[in-house]
Regions:
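C-terminal helical subdomain
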Residues: 183, 207-242, 246, 253-255
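Conserved glycine-rich cofactor-binding loop
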Residues: 16-17
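Substrate-binding pocket helix/loop in short-chain dehydrogenase/reductase
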Residues: 98-100, 104-112, 216
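Residue(s) in the substrate-gating loop at a strand-loop-helix junction
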Residues: 143
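Short, small/polar-rich loop/turn modules that mediate ligand/substrate recognition or access, typified
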Residues: 175, 180, 246-248
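Short C-terminal tail/terminal secondary-structure segment
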Residues: 4, 94-97, 148, 235-236, ...
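Active-site helix of classical SDR
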Residues: 123, 159, 167
Length: 261
């Protein structure tokens, strides 16, 4: 049995559903201790009832876009451990769908607060714990939209470009502390969020949801969806000692996205 993450301590934001929970499950299966936080009580309650909820899984309610909430979360985690091996900044929202002249400043502010500023809140507090650990890994969730842009999703695309900028800058700043920082760009994930994105885009363009689905799949050279567990596996690699020389990188787990439109 693969226990390559034995004794590793990992914090995952938005960790009770989607990519976050898929990643938590893979990490737990490899022997890690995992701290997950989420704003959604319904997902947290499901996780509490999951068979994997044992002595290596700790569950917290937290609004990642609220700095006071994040501060309180870290106070609770510090009662359990003074060190971290990895922070996974996974929290994010899809943001609005529409051309830029139809968007409001509130659309922008909400998307950036959740997708970018939350990374600052978590990273600032995690760095001392990673330093105490004499090194570790920070993994930031970006997107293909953070490389190519994404028509009708300008706040989302801008936020994911920002995540890559943060990643590369922190990799430079933290390397001397043996802290590696990388970004993952997931592709079109088959999951609840994509259901909402497809619905909104179909409504905006006045086409069928099936047509939008087909369009998303055709954007990749592998003509495939990506699954949440695929991202979890990449996270595990970037946490593990096998990736000890990898930092400042932007890793696509996306079936080779060719375009985004």
């Amino acid at each position: 049995m693969d226990k390559s993450l034995r004794n590793k301590k990992i914090l995952i934001s938005a960790g009770a559903s989607g990519i976050g929970w898929a990643t938590a499950k893979v990490c737990l299966s490899k022997g890690a201790t995992v701290y997950v936080c989420d704003i959604e009580s319904k997902y947290l309650n499901k996780v509490k009832k999951h068979p994997l909820n044992n002595k290596k899984l700790f569950i917290y309610h937290c609004d990642a876009s609220n700095e006071l909430d994040v501060n309180e979360l870290f106070k609770k985690i510090l009662k359990k451990t003074k060190k971290l091996d990895c922070l996974i900044n996974n929290v994010g929202v899809a943001g609005p769908t529409g051309t830029i002249e139809k968007l409001t400043s509130k659309h922008w502010e909400k998307t950036l607060k959740i997708n970018v500023i939350s990374h600052f809140y978590f990273t600032k507090l995690a760095i001392p714990m990673l330093k105490k650990n004499k090194g570790g890994s920070i993994i930031n969730m970006s997107s293909g939209a953070g490389i190519m842009g994404f028509p009708l999703r300008s706040p989302y695309a801008a936020s994911k470009w920002a995540v890559i900028g943060i990643t590369k800058t922190l990799a430079m700043e933290l390397g001397k502390f043996k802290i590696r920082v990388n970004a993952i760009c997931p592709g079109t994930i088959k999951g609840d969020r994509m259901v909402r994105v497809i619905r909104d885009k179909a409504k905006f363009l006045k086409i069928s949801k099936k047509a939008v689905e087909n369009e998303f799949v055709s954007m990749t050279s592998l003509n495939t969806w990506v699954y949440e567990k695929d991202i979890g596996k990449m996270c595990c690699y970037l946490i593990s000692d096998e990736s000890s020389r990898i930092s400042g990188q932007v890793v696509g787990v996306d079936g080779n996205t060719l375009r985004m439109h």
